[in-house]
Amino acid sequence: MSEKMKDQREGGFLIAKIHQITNRMFTQMLKDYGLEEVNPGQGRILFALWQEDDIPIRELSRKTQLTKSTLTTMLKRLEAAGFLTRNSDEDDERITKVKLSVKSKNLQKKFVEVSKMMTEVFYGTFTEEEIDRFEGYLRRILDNLIKTK
């Protein structure tokens, strides 16, 4: 490969394009399964809370890689829609904790099903070995980006 070609790598462009198309498809799949109240970005927050509920916003920010200001805006919308509550920590009122509502817990099974379907579309003809290798490369890219922040 020539030096000129190496300077014009398309990894970032391809990742952005994949994100855009995946987001559009996932939004449609959520709608098709009656989950139109939740968009993929909000699903990312709910998914993190399904893994560990009743956690401080700071921890949720770390898990989702969303800034606190972006997360706060999204949490307000999710709270207004009845998916979660935000309350001060009993031991330290400076800490705001996020807790899932029954409504969001009831969505979990359907949301996970749609996520699995999206994963099947996403990886299509990949072998397990290719998926493992690909995800390893993505983790390295993510680590590189986090280190440079």
Features from the language model and the residues they span:
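N-terminal positioning helix adjacent to the helix-turn-helix/winged-helix DNA-binding module
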Residues: 7, 11, 41-42, 103, ...
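N-terminal leader segment of winged-helix/HTH proteins
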Residues: 1-36
